[in-house]
Curated annotation (Swiss-Prot):
Role, per record: Specifically methylates the N7 position of guanine in position 527 of 16S rRNA.
Molecular function (Gene Ontology), one example: rRNA (guanine-N7-)-methyltransferase activity
Protein name (record): Ribosomal RNA small subunit methyltransferase G
Chain positions recorded as S-adenosyl-L-methionine binding sites: G74, F79, R143
Disulfide bonds: none
Gene (name only): rsmG
Enzyme class: transferase
Pfam families, A to Z: GidB (PF02527)
Enzyme Commission number(s): 2.1.1.170
Length: 210
């Protein structure tokens, strides 16, 4: 198990306060209790939530250090959405909407938001029904949710209106990108993951149909 340290968090996310680090450590303990009941993440990764999930999510703050209006789709156990909520608490006026239709997972997300007074809101709807409920974001995130082509279909109402996507992807991301260009054109920046040697964060912008 990787050690919890402010340094590891700052290596992933950039400048982060000691207070935010302490809050994330408390969140990790709370997460472990809930995960034993409702299986928020696979048991194979539950023993290293700090490295595999929290730090993996936190690296988005380094990639985009300024945006204040975010939406995370298919938020599940809160990665990356809840982690970003903790980090966005350090940005004046920042907030994130968490779209999650599973009632138990939405309840978990809402409990964490209330416990830590996070700048976040749960949108308990299916993703395709959430667009009218979420003000136009600057950043859209998703992790371990769907193929890139499906993600683009789900997020097109936002990405074709000026938002950028930050999507965690694994070793097969190039095939997903190639599949997506049959339907969409977009600008793409590949950010190597700081936690997974085979992973990337795909930054997509200027989405338009072809």
């Amino acid at each position: 198990m990787s050690s919890f340290s402010l340094e590891s968090l700052q290596d992933a996310a950039g400048p982060v306060s000691r207070e935010t680090f302490d809050r994330l450590v408390a969140f990790e303990a709370m997460f472990q209790k809930w995960n034993r009941s409702i299986n928020l993440v696979a048991q194979s990764t539950a023993g290293d939530v700090w490295q595999r999930h929290i730090l993996d999510s936190a690296q988005l703050a380094r990639i985009e250090p300024n945006a204040t209006h975010w939406v995370d789709i298919g938020s599940g156990g809160g990665f990356p959405g809840l982690v970003m909520a903790f980090l966005l608490a350090e940005r004046a006026g920042a907030s994130i909407d968490l779209v999650e239709c599973n009632r138990k997972k939405a309840s978990f997300l809402q409990t964490v938001i209330g416990q830590f007074n996070l700048p976040a809101r749960v949108v308990a709807r299916r993703i395709k029904d959430s667009h009218a409920l979420v003000p136009q974001p600057q950043i859209v995130t998703a992790r371990a949710l769907a193929s890139l082509s499906v993600l683009l279909e789900l997020t097109a109402p936002w990405l074709t209106s000026g938002a950028r996507g930050l999507f965690h992807k694994g070793r097969d991301y190039r095939a997903e990108v190639q599949e997506s260009v049959n339907r969409w054109a977009f600008d793409l920046v590949e950010h190597p993951s700081v936690t997974d040697p085979h992973g990337v964060i795909l930054e997509l912008s200027n989405l338009r149909p072809v």
